[in-house]
């Protein structure tokens, strides 16, 4: 069987994954067409990489199959300030997915996911840095790390995250209340502790980064 030669590639969606994959393919001499309902260079662009938090988070290895998430779901659903929303008329269609999700909410699956997420994410910042060398990231990217803070009420959940990341060798620094306030003096002294991930980056303008990368095509 002869070696397959790719003549061209079509990519659906010009979010951060789409444009980064497209750029790498173009560098290999493969013509690329990206399909999206919006023009990336227009002000009407509304893809997944528009208006999000914009964190480059190589530490984010724990996903939603963590063992303690089920205890938080009811509170998140019924709180008007919660991060989770559900269209109840769509709920019956989600039963199969939800049962599969429940099956994977166990320690073994959680650690399996975290292990392989770490293998991918540990390469992500270096991969982005290669691209950032080719664009002007002034006012687009901040390299200040990220701080998570919590109260004693949330301590059990945070201990789980810290242990899993520590076991995987992820660089993190635990903070006392005093150290949290030294780093973020505008916070009220209601948080008991925190952790800082100094290798994390933040996109000040995710849409601007997308446009800058796309202009390399």
Question: Where in this protein do the model-derived segments appear?
Answer:
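Rossmann-like flavin
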Residues: 95-215
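Short, glycine/serine-rich, charged loops/turns that create anion-binding
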Residues: 39, 63, 153-154
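Active-site catalytic microenvironments for nucleophilic, acid-base chemistry
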Residues: 24-28, 134, 216
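Glycine-rich FAD pyrophosphate-binding loop
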Residues: 27-50
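N-terminal Rossmann-like FAD-binding beta1-loop-alpha1 element of flavoenzymes
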Residues: 6-34
């Amino acid at each position: 069987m002869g070696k397959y030669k790719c003549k061209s590639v079509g990519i659906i969606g010009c979010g951060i994954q789409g444009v980064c994959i497209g750029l790498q393919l173009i560098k290999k001499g493969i013509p690329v067409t990206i399909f999206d309902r919006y023009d990336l260079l227009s002000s009407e662009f509304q893809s997944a990489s528009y208006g999000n938090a914009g964190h480059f988070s190589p530490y984010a290895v724990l996903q939603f199959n963590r063992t303690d998430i089920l205890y938080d779901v009811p509170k998140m659903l019924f709180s008007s300030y919660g991060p989770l929303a559900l269209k109840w008329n769509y709920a019956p269609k989600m039963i199969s997915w939800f049962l599969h999700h429940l099956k994977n909410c166990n320690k073994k699956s959680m650690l399996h996911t975290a292990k392989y997420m770490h293998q991918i994410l540990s390469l992500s910042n270096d991969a982005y840095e290669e691209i950032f060398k080719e664009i002007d990231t002034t006012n687009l990217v901040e390299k200040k790390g990220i701080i998570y803070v919590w109260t004693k009420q949330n301590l059990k959940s945070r201990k789980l995250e810290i242990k899993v990341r520590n076991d995987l060798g992820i660089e993190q620094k635990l903070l006392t209340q005093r150290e949290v306030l030294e780093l973020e003096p505008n916070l009220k002294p209601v948080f008991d502790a925190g952790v800082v991930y100094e290798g994390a980056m933040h996109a000040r303008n995710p849409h601007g980064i997308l446009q800058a990368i796309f202009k390399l095509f």
